[in-house]
Structures are given as structure tokens and as C-alpha cells.
Amino acid sequence: MRRALVAVIALAIALPACSGSADPATGTTGSGATPSAVADPATGSTGASTGVVEAATIPEPDAWIPRRVGVLVDRLESVWEVRREAVRRWVRTGDPAAWPPPEEVELLVLYEQRIYRVLAANDRLAAAVLGRLDGGLAAEARSNVRAGSALYDHFSPVKTLPDFRTRAPEPADRLLRFFEEGQRRFGVTWQTLAAVMLIETRMGRIASSSSAGAQGPMQFIPSTWAAYGLGGDIRDEHDAVLGAANYLHANGAPGNDRAALFHYNPVPAYVAAVTGYANAMTRDPELFYAYYNWQVFVRTTHGDVRLTGPGL
């Protein structure tokens, strides 16, 4: 279809142009349950949390990430619990239809994201940490690490920092409505559409066109957009989501999501990453609100460089 953006997507590496050939693998990414309808997997409750996140539990934007297995496991478990509470409170008693998100949510999610980037780049450390997790965190962490590792293994870091333009994304609930509309109209799960935008532009935070000319929050080549964009604006989030849903539906989704995603971007690592994040949101739909707050990083030969988020 098109080529998917320059490196910054999950890892700051340019993805090659789509060939239009189908992936022989098949599979779907799950149900269409929405965050507002999901129960807490740990307790079965759908009630709002009344807890208050203590300031001492909120990490600074560049807080240290331990490399000792036991310490890292403890840190990930504690931050995961606090983040889930903070997200649940934001979704159920706050206003996820407005920008910006609560600072506590941004900071907690950022710390988790940085941990997963460390694990994705270190197979031995990841295996040791994942082996000591259980329950919902274990499943979520496996999805995040495997998706990140697939992209890390396939793409190399860049030597120089690309010139990216970034911006604030549309509010979380507004994007979610667009994804749900794409599911209603074309049958492509909202989780798949959200995972595509997550990888392509971090939910619209990347405003630049790619080096290959792909444009907008779903990174379409203009010629492909002309065929599948339904007459909309390539840079408009609503129109881009519907165009992506139309394209994926035309190439096998739902029912053969992997083949459809391979048409979207013919890189197995990309297909694996989208599928992993989509499956994670299928297991826990409220995870969408965490992924929504993932920031733009560029993976360089000198280490990660963060371009968006708290403290910048």
C-alpha cells in the first residue's frame, strides 16, 4: 500500500514501501469490546476507583530504570498497579474527551514505556523479568516486549536525529470514537486500528510526512489514499482512520488481519507488533488509554531520544 514512516514509529526507523503481496499467515486480533464496558481483570469490578495516587509514587520524566532483575520486576509491578488505578480514575471520573491527560497518567505511562524499551533491546533481561511476572501484568508485558523486540530486531538505530514535527494528539475518547466507527463500518476491530496509529505516528503526535512521502496520522502514500481515502483529508484523524479501515477491509480484514496488515506494510515485524498491541487491548480495553499516552522516541546509535511528553 505505502511505506510506513521513518524510524520514529515505535523505534525511529524507516519502514519500507508496501509490496501489495499477502502474508500467508492468518489470524484476527479479537473482539470489539470498548474500554467503558470492561471489568477489572483482577477483581471483576467495573466500579470507579476512589483511591488517590500518592505524589511519591509518580516517577519523574527521566527517572532511573534499574537493570537488576528483582528490582526491575518490583518497580514494574508497583508502577503497573498505580498506573491502572490512575487510568481508571481518569476514564471513569475525569475527562478523556479533553486534552491534556492528567499529568500522573502521562508520567506513569512514560515510565512503563521506558521500561519496555529497555526490555525490548535486551533479550536476556527481558526473559528474566518476564519469567517472574504473573497475571494480567505478565500478559501485557509479554505483548509489549515481543512487539518492541520484533521491531528492534528488524530495524537498526539511526545515526542522526531526523527532523520531525510533532504536535498534541486528538483527545483519547475522540480517537476512540473514530476507531469504533471504523469497526462499525468496515468490520476491522478498533484495537487493530488503534495499534496501527500507535505504531505509525504515536496516535497522531508525529506531524511530519515520511521520507517516502507517506502522510497523515495513518501514514498513507497519496496514490493509495486516492483509492481508499473515501474522498477525505489524508491528514485528518477521522478520515485517516476510516481510510485505513477501508484499506484493511479490502485486503482481508476481518478474518485475515495478518494478511491485511502485511498489505498495509509488508514487514513481518510490523505485522507482529500491530497484532501484539491489538491483542493486548482486546484482553484489557482500558489499556488503550495507556497506549494513547506513549510518547515519541527516536532510537539512535547513541541511545533513545524522546521528542514528546512531560518535561519537554
Model feature map: region roles:
Residues 97, 164, 209-210, 229, ...:
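Residue-level detector of alpha-helix boundaries and kinks
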Residues 107, 111, 195-198, 243, ...:
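Amphipathic alpha-helical interaction segments
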Residues 124-128, 187-195, 208, 253-264, ...:
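Surface-exposed patches in mature extracellular/periplasmic domains of secreted proteins
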Residues 207-210, 274-275:
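Short, solvent-exposed loop/turn and secondary-structure capping segments
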